[in-house]
Regions:
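Phosphate-binding loop of NTP-binding sites
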Residues: 9-12, 86-220, 224-236, 291-294
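General small-molecule cofactor/ligand-binding pocket signal
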Residues: 79, 130, 241
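Short beta->alpha junction loops/turns
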Residues: 46, 81-84, 135, 161, ...
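N-terminal leader/targeting and accessory segments in enzymes
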Residues: 1-90, 282, 288, 302-303
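Alpha-helix C-terminal capping segments
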Residues: 60, 173-175, 298-301
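Acidic, Mg2+-coordinating active-site environments of NTP-dependent enzymes
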Residues: 67-75, 181-305
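Short, well-ordered turn and helix-capping elements at secondary-structure junctions
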Residues: 28-31, 44, 91, 110, ...
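Glycine-rich, charged/polar anion/phosphate-binding loops
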Residues: 25-27, 165-168, 251-253
């Protein structure tokens, strides 16, 4: 019987180690939130050093620790590596390769966490659904969340953040999403880029950096949509779905009625399907997120009865 998460034998295989079997329940970088059975990665950063917390990790019930220097005073199983962050990335990439999970990667200048959290809420009754935690979307958090995803997960939803060009590419090489979603291109990160076009190019890494992708979902009304579409045409991605508030997309708003407190929407989906829902007047900004979610569920062939 396979373990619920990555197993010690699989870790031994990847890192040429010889540790005896122990139950692994996920992974952590922080002893304050570490759970019993978690792998502890002693990350050495500019302002803190995880190696100082090996004893705390042992007391909290960590299963094993990845370290750059062995703590001989601890009885915790330890694997010495050259760089613990690289080890985290390598282990997450390896574990991902063992899974049959459909992975959905979400990026955009705004709305990533809200969209992912809404998906989590809608599918809360579903078993075998995993959504990465809020803001765990960088080189530390995303691979950590892959290791926290149970082996039997059917659909995994992850957000990918960036501040510089090339960051999403590195995350995609680990995550290998089956479906990639770009919510929007805005000037949120303009401080590190010269133009919105540069942001669009950097965001496009979510679908140009992997051959695993079956489907791409784009907001047809976002900045530089034509650029993103042109990049899509140069890939081997089988399916593209777009959404907008207008009727020139795969998923669009067919009817819109506004009352004092609610915006009632009737949305058209491929196959002549219609779905109705409402959002509060003060949450009109969530409409694009809702359209993205509906498009994603269609691409996954998930029944819209769950909405």
């Amino acid at each position: 019987m396979k373990s619920s998460h990555i197993s010690i034998s699989e870790i031994n295989n990847l890192f040429n180690a010889k540790h005896s079997e122990i139950k692994i329940t996920g992974a952590s970088l922080d002893t304050r939130t570490l759970k019993k059975g978690n792998i502890f990665f002693a990350i050495k950063g500019k302002n803190s050093d995880g190696h100082k917390f090996i004893n705390q990790a042992e007391k909290k019930g960590a299963s094993i620790a990845f370290v750059q220097k062995i703590n001989s005073k601890s009885n915790l199983k330890q694997i010495k590596v050259k760089n613990t962050l690289s080890a985290l990335s390598s282990l997450a990439r390896y574990y991902r390769s063992l899974l049959n999970t459909q992975i959905i990667g979400i990026t955009g200048s705004v709305g990533k966490t809200g969209t992912k959290d809404a998906i989590s809420f809608i599918l809360k009754e579903h078993k075998n659904i995993f959504c990465s935690r809020q803001s765990y979307n960088n080189k530390y958090g995303m691979p950590l969340e892959i290791l926290n995803m149970p082996r039997k997960t059917k659909f995994g939803f992850f957000e990918l953040g960036m501040n510089h060009s090339g960051e999403i590419k590195r995350l995609v090489k680990i995550l290998k999403p089956n479906i990639s979603i770009i919510l929007n291109i805005e000037n949120v990160h303009l401080g590190n880029f010269k133009s919105l076009k540069e942001i669009a190019v950097a965001k496009s890494e979510i679908f140009t950096s992997s051959e695993n992708i079956d489907s791409l979902i784009l907001n047809k009304e976002t900045n530089h949509y034509n650029l993103l579409y042109r990049y899509y045409k140069s890939t081997k991605i089988k399916n593209i779905y777009n959404y907008s508030k207008k009727n020139n997309s795969n998923v669009y708003i067919k009817e819109r009625k506004v009352t004092k407190k609610i915006i009632q929407l009737k949305v058209s989906l491929p196959g002549d399907k219609l779905i109705s829902f409402g959002v509060r007047i003060d949450q009109e900004n969530l409409i694009d997120n809702c359209l993205a979610i509906l498009t994603c569920f269609h691409a996954l062939n998930l029944s819209l009865i769950h909405i």
